């Protein structure tokens, strides 16, 4: 086969572009199906506690005691979205509030995590919130410039 293109083209004459891969985030633990019951705030740090710990993602999926810490939370960019009727598509009603206001105003709650998303300085949880005998879909966005730390009991 004779190839007469330039070094910036492939065999079909298409200009090659540089490809950079953002590796998938493989967290050692998941909060999927865990029930968040408390946010403790110390300065710009959040300690998020669940009713029954965390689940390891190493294939065994063992449940372990633990909680999650977020450091250097940027409160002006951290939000909670409370969406109306759960599980439906189409139009909805809801409320957006600062995460700090949510933590201050809603003390007794259960937030069942269904999905976790990790991005650049951002952790997002989607799930269902139960508070004051109300049930709604909920999205919690935590913008943190510091580390996210999974704290577990070392049973070795």
Regions found by a protein language model. Name each.
Residues 3-156:
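Surface-exposed, interaction-prone regions used to assemble/regulate multi-protein complexes
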